[in-house]
Amino acid sequence: MTSETRTLYSQLPAIDRLLHDSAFLSLRDRYGHTQVVDLLRRMLDDARDVIRNTQTLPDWYADWAQEAKLRLENAAQSALRPVINLTGTVLHTNLGRALQAQEAVEAVTQAMRAPVTLEYDLDGAGRGHRDRALATLLCRITGAEDACIVNNNAAAVLLMLAATASGKEVVVSRGELVEIGGAFRIPDVMRQAGCTLHEVGTTNRTHAKDYRQAVNENTGLLMKVHTSNYSIEGFTKTVEEAELAEIGRELDIPVVADLGSGSLVDLSQYGLPKEPMPQQLIAAGVSMVSFSGDKLLGGPQAGIIVGKKAMIAQLQSHPLKRALRADKMTLAALEATLRLYLHPEALAEKLPTLRLLTRSEASIREQAQRLQARLAARYGDEFALEVKPCLSQIGSGSLPVDRLPSAAMTFTPHDGRGSRLEALAARWRTLPVPVIGRIYDGRLWLDMRCLEDESRFMEMMLK
């Protein structure tokens, strides 16, 4: 160690002296003595590393309190930070999928703040069932005999298979052996459930006779899987749920369906692409239907299974049900969301997912044009700002081919350097509420479809 290095080490302050500095009093009051001391120890270690590697003091040496304040504030930020989603993907999996309705937020808050009748029967003063209230609502909406709630749709599929077909064959069309995010594959789930996959048909064509010929003494289920995250077009043939249900009745084999996204309303009435609805499959005679709570339904993450009472009872009594059951916050949010469907006239206004999906291109474009001049005054020296037409997508594997006409604010660097776009996007990610767009075709695009808090957005962007 050189004498110069020893001199630099000697200039590092003692923790006790820093703690008695008036600048640290407010930090100790806000974050507590223990947390501040732990941080100062780490800062001293960092300072020693800087001295050892560069033979200089750290650049924050002159103001330890300010550096400590910045580090404490950064550490105190929640890992789940609110962001402004201008990616053009409404149900963005990485950004938490469906926004919750105000009614759902209030229901969750109430469920967290007080004991609730999660598994308590007020009439009989005894134990109740946590799915009961939601099952009643779901049966009213879908026409099913009963319902079961778990923590996501992958869990719903696993439970359906394990509880009703473990040790047996499950017949599925080859064209429906889907994989969703995280390498969740139907064949893998079947193995975990103890089922044997029996593929029928080909990738693009499956006929009714394929299912009939596949049935044997060890067949447990006939299964339909909605290919919600991809589409096969051209020379294709599939067996519709109603026809498969008829085959199931003939052969006395239950038919189950995994809808994936699952919409409880006909989206075509809002000018959106039509998506299969659980109530249609129930009416067609399908024994059980599973779907997600946090996609097109617009609620919290949950797996919902509706169907025949006897089969739902098998699910409720299976050991996996306890491992996969939903908690009180999920159930509270889901119940509040489902109640919105009882008032369909107000659904597009009260359900954020539907409200965002049904925004007209004209209203989005008008919003972008209204903000353009003010943003150009802030960013125009470096970037050319234009309002351009674009196509939003629904996201989360819902309606993968369909796009929604929208409008975006685009930023193109005057000097054509892509690094400026990366730097701008990075700068926006450091805002108090990060703004997330996408870089494409030499521009940074901000699709305005999901921008609702316009004043907050502009306040941050203009700083």
Swiss-Prot record:
Q: Which UniProt keywords apply?
A: Cytoplasm, Protein biosynthesis, Pyridoxal phosphate, Selenium, Transferase
- What are its E.C. numbers? 2.9.1.1
| Places the protein is found | Cytoplasm
The family database entries (Pfam families) matched by this protein are listed as:
Se-cys_synth_N, SelA
The pathway it acts in is: Aminoacyl-tRNA biosynthesis; selenocysteinyl-tRNA(Sec) biosynthesis; selenocysteinyl-tRNA(Sec) from L-seryl-tRNA(Sec) (bacterial route): step 1/1
What InterPro entries does this protein's entry cite?
PyrdxlP-dep_Trfase (IPR015424), PyrdxlP-dep_Trfase_major (IPR015421), SelA-like (IPR018319), SelA_trans (IPR004534), SelA_trans_N_dom (IPR025862)
Cofactor(s), by name: pyridoxal 5'-phosphate
Q: How does it assemble?
A: Homodecamer; pentamer of dimers. Binds only one seryl-tRNA(Sec) per dimer.
Know the name of this protein?
A: L-seryl-tRNA(Sec) selenium transferase
This protein's encoding gene = selA
